[in-house]
A protein has these predicted regions:
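Short helix-capping segments at alpha-helix termini
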Residues: 42-45, 164-169, 195-197
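Flexible loop/hinge segments that line or gate small-molecule binding clefts
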Residues: 78-124
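Amphipathic helical "hinge" segments at domain boundaries
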Residues: 3-65, 72-75, 156-159
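Hinge/beta->alpha junction and helix N-cap segments in small-molecule ligand-binding domains
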Residues: 24-33, 51-59, 114-125, 141-163, ...
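Short hydrophobic/charged patches on amphipathic alpha-helices used for structural packing
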Residues: 8, 62-65, 87, 127, ...
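Periplasmic-binding protein-like
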Residues: 22, 72-80, 139-142, 175, ...
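Residues that mark the start of a beta-strand
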Residues: 18, 135-137
Length: 199
């Protein structure tokens, strides 16, 4: 009548060969491609990936703490993240971590590094291209800039470009929040076109 308990089994293991991959958002196509590449790379090593998807509005560091207690990973890859979540609780995590898509240089943790894009510069470059080609009524779909650091950085890059070109950006009219999924983006685009048909 013995029923194995997975949590007990993992607690009993002194070492794990798993690398936890925490993915914020279940429908982000960019993250899906990154996860696939990470899994391919790890197949060539002695490690395996333990992929954990979570809602994009949840706290990734709290989830990492749970994973560290229950699964004891060798390290954690964070796909998506909010720097304020790391500032609050990351010191409790002892394994190495890597932020992917977010910059970690302002976070004071020796066991945390990052591989990222300069979202401000990239968004500014994209917006510069549109404005230099005489597009001025430009709609932007993005995440909630109060919750998503990446969305906030991209929005700031767009604003910098508008300012550089001597233009104002009307956020109420031309910015629409959405989650990082095709369905949410479609619904946001419909809302945006209803309030700004001049796009």
């Amino acid at each position: 009548n013995f029923i194995p308990n997975n949590n007990a089994k993992h607690l009993k293991q002194s070492t794990s060969k798993n690398i936890a991959v925490l993915v914020k958002g279940t429908s982000n196509m960019l993250f899906a491609n990154i996860v696939e590449e990470v899994q391919k790379m790890l197949e060539e090593t002695k490690y395996s990936a333990e992929v954990c998807y979570m809602d994009e509005d949840k706290n990734e560091v709290e989830q990492a703490l749970i994973l560290c207690r229950e699964r004891k990973p060798m390290g954690i890859l964070f796909l998506g993240g909010n720097p304020s979540n790391f500032k609050e609780k990351y010191e409790q995590i002892e394994v190495p971590g890597v932020l992917i898509t977010n910059c970690g240089k302002e976070l004071p943790f020796e066991n945390l590094s990052s591989v990222s894009v300069d979202d401000i510069a990239a968004a500014k470059q994209a917006m510069d291209y549109l404005l230099e080609n005489k597009h001025t009524n430009i709609g932007i779909l993005g995440g909630d800039i109060t919750l998503s650091h990446t969305s906030q950085q991209r929005y700031l890059g767009c604003l910098e470009s508008f300012k550089k070109h001597g233009l104002e950006f009307d956020k109420e009219k031309y910015y629409e929040n959405c989650r990082f999924s095709f369905d949410s983006a479609y619904r946001a685009m419909v809302r945006l076109l209803e309030k700004a048909p001049d796009i």
